[in-house]
């Protein structure tokens, strides 16, 4: 059966890598629909994303690539089927609402398996879209206890990605390790500036002239994970902290949905706490 798949390759840079990869694909009678590559000259590392069509013998293809490419090569062959996400929320609706609307009208090609909140405020919004909402309250629980319950509920849906749509709790290291490079967060500032809570108040006090938002994968350092997408807007001295917050919400939802779209289409490589987007 003819299928479409995406081949993601990264390895130490060397001469002739593109030719080697494309020749192997040709020998497997696979048609290359799109191809993008990048070399990081500082780290001497090569990245390539290849969209393929044909009849796949996945094990043999990956074995041939491994034999022909440098020893430290990473190759992944990914199907193009629709991906599943679980969204985590607290009380703010703008990022969640944007994802729900874009998914409803087909602008995001994703299955939203469930939305989980540590408060119940957004249940009505979610259920209007006929999507399950689950309350996993943090009250009277330690962070570890709450995150354990949260992970158990998430795992019922086997998502490809977990999206933190203004989820306002810090996740413990065990939770993060359970989903490496699969948890996407939106931070309400242009990282690495103004990490942590109340970034707009911090920005106002500093008299900044731009405010922004950052979507990133989470790791065990607060707001320090690999950055996927950023954007900014101009502000001036007439903006107080509340006006900055209102303007920032528009940037946040746009940046998060763009980052999610990149992940859904397998365009992100994570390397040395940075991302390469192809």
Curated annotation (Swiss-Prot):
The gene is purU. Gene3D superfamilies: 3.30.70.260, Formyl transferase, N-terminal domain. This is Formyltetrahydrofolate deformylase. Belongs to the PurU family. Its EC number is 3.5.1.10. Pathway: Purine metabolism; IMP biosynthesis via de novo pathway; formate from 10-formyl-5,6,7,8-tetrahydrofolate: step 1/1. The active site is at 223. Keywords: Hydrolase, One-carbon metabolism, Purine biosynthesis. Coiled coil: none annotated. Catalyzes the hydrolysis of 10-formyltetrahydrofolate (formyl-FH4) to formate and tetrahydrofolate (FH4). Pfam families: ACT (PF01842), Formyl_trans_N (PF00551).
